[in-house]
Amino acid sequence: MMLSPREQEKLLIVVAANLARSRKERGLKLNYPEAISMIAFEILEGARDGKSVSELMQAGREVLTVDDVMDGIADMIHDVQVEATFPDGTKLVTVHQPIK
């Protein structure tokens, strides 16, 4: 199976997000890469489902709370930017202050 670099990156996000979700369900607090992957995954899947950029910007703020991540992680993540494929093309989705 031949995957482009972009497809490889998306696949890596899916794997990381699944691992993060599993750890969160076990009651573990997430680290930086786990938090980013969960937010990015929700944006990518939301775009695939046909949601708008504005809907995804809001949804990205609802994925995690400060209680879900290790101390200091929420302060480290100011913005999450994901290039997602929508029915009308590829767009950059930016979520400001995604963890509150």
Curated annotation (Swiss-Prot):
EC class name: hydrolase
Reactions listed under catalytic activity: urea + 2 H2O + H(+) = hydrogencarbonate + 2 NH4(+)
GO terms of biological process kind: urea catabolic process
EC number assigned by the record: 3.5.1.5
Associated pathway: Nitrogen metabolism; urea degradation; CO(2) and NH(3) from urea (urease route): step 1/1
One Pfam family linked to the record: Urease_gamma
Keyword Cytoplasm assigned: yes
Compartments it resides in: Cytoplasm
Single Gene Ontology MF annotation: nickel cation binding
The entry's keywords: Cytoplasm, Hydrolase
UniProt key word Hydrolase: yes
Domain of life of the source: Bacteria
UniProt GO cellular component terms: cytoplasm
Main location as per UniProt: cytoplasm
Family under the similarity heading: Belongs to the urease gamma subunit family.
Assembly mode: Heterotrimer of UreA (gamma), UreB (beta) and UreC (alpha) subunits. Three heterotrimers associate to form the active enzyme.
Protein name listed in UniProt: Urease subunit gamma
Gene name per UniProt: ureA
